[in-house]
């Protein structure tokens, strides 16, 4: 059964799933699509063509789907936000809709945990199981791979790509691409080591060892792209392949490694 507070504004045309809860003074636009068992808390605003997956929660005064902060954007352009299942969007977070420079949509996968005051700009593409700590700020067109964690108070420059399973330390500033399964830190952030905590949670010891050897081979000495090409030869680990292909395809470059060679 839906529970909608009398003071909430639900525009005609909005699609609401089963057992939705919409609290006082919340706003849902006519083009929004809200999944089953979604909770929209007091004062939250769901705007434009926004889809929110089942079992998600949008906390007080978060704004999802407002127009992008892009001076080239024209309001007649179709745009919106697509969010997967089991998302948590905490207080005062802002997620802007996409632009014609992308496909018109900002996209976030399943199981996202977006903490208070985070900002996700237009056309960002976030994978599954993403965590953004308080005040993390993603500029336009940023891409985050699955299982990536971004620490609090960390801005990420537009068009940066962060690979799967990365950890970006709090109070860093990121302007270049980060290789999958790595930990980056600093202003400007550089790769320091493997994200050992993250990969040990997901992979067995043999795979962790393979990733550790690959990291040392890639970053210890020589040209990074040449190392990646050589490592790809006869490589059996799909995760090591992801690291190598990411290095070979980067457009913004990989930040200089300043860690210890003991990952």
From Swiss-Prot:
This entry's Enzyme Commission designation comes to 2.3.1.129
Spell out the molecular function terms from Gene Ontology: acyl-[acyl-carrier-protein]-UDP-N-acetylglucosamine O-acyltransferase activity
Where exactly are the transmembrane stretches of this chain?
Answer: none
Recorded catalytic reaction(s): these are: a (3R)-hydroxyacyl-[ACP] + UDP-N-acetyl-alpha-D-glucosamine = a UDP-3-O-[(3R)-3-hydroxyacyl]-N-acetyl-alpha-D-glucosamine + holo-[ACP]
Query: Which PROSITE patterns does the annotation name?
Result: HEXAPEP_TRANSFERASES (PS00101)
Q: In which pathway does it act?
A: Glycolipid biosynthesis; lipid IV(A) biosynthesis; lipid IV(A) from (3R)-3-hydroxytetradecanoyl-[acyl-carrier-protein] and UDP-N-acetyl-alpha-D-glucosamine: step 1/6
Superkingdom per UniProt: Bacteria
InterPro entries recorded for this chain? Answer: Acetyltransf_C, Acetyltransf_C_sf, Hexapep, Hexapep_transf_CS, Lipid_A_LpxA, Trimer_LpxA-like_sf
One GO cellular component term of this record is: cytoplasm
Can you say where in the cell this protein is located? Cytoplasm
Q: Which GO terms describe its biological process?
A: lipid A biosynthetic process
What is the uppermost EC class here?
transferase
Q: What is its main location?
A: cytoplasm
Which terms are listed as keywords in the entry?
Acyltransferase, Cytoplasm, Lipid A biosynthesis, Lipid biosynthesis, Lipid metabolism, Repeat, Transferase
Family per record: Belongs to the transferase hexapeptide repeat family. LpxA subfamily.
**Subunit structure as annotated in this protein's UniProt entry:** Homotrimer.
Q: What does this protein do?
A: Involved in the biosynthesis of lipid A, a phosphorylated glycolipid that anchors the lipopolysaccharide to the outer membrane of the cell.
What protein does this entry describe? Answer: Acyl-[acyl-carrier-protein]--UDP-N-acetylglucosamine O-acyltransferase
Organism equals: Campylobacter jejuni subsp. jejuni serotype O:2 (strain ATCC 700819 / NCTC 11168)
Q: Which gene encodes it?
A: lpxA
């Amino acid at each position: 059964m839906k529970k909608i507070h009398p003071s909430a504004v639900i525009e005609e045309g909005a699609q609401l799933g089963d057992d939705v809860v919409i609290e006082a003074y919340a706003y849902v636009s006519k083009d929004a699509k809200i999944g089953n068992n979604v909770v929209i808390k007091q004062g939250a605003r769901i705007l434009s063509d926004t889809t929110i997956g089942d079992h998600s929660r949008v906390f007080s005064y978060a704004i999802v789907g407002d127009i992008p902060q892009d001076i080239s954007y024209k309001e007649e352009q179709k745009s919106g936000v697509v969010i997967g299942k089991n998302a948590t969007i905490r207080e005062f977070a802002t997620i802007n809709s996409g632009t014609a420079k992308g496909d018109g949509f900002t996209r976030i996968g399943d199981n996202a945990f977006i903490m208070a005051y985070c900002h996700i700009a237009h056309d960002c593409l976030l994978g599954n199981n993403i965590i953004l700590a308080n005040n993390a700020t993603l500029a336009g067109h940023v891409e985050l791979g699955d299982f990536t964690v971004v620490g609090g108070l960390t801005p990420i420059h537009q068009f940066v790509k962060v690979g799967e399973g990365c950890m970006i330390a709090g109070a860093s500033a990121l302007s270049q691409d980060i290789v999958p399964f790595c930990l980056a830190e600093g202003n400007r952030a550089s790769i320091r080591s493997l994200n050992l905590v993250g990969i040990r949670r997901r992979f067995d010891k043999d795979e962790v060892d393979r990733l550790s050897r690959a990291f040392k081979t890639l970053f210890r000495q020589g040209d990074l792209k040449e190392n990646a090409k050589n490592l790809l030869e006869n490589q059996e680990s799909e995760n090591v392949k992801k690291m190598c292909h990411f290095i070979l395809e980067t457009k913004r470059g990989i930040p200089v490694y300043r860690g210890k060679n003991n990952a």
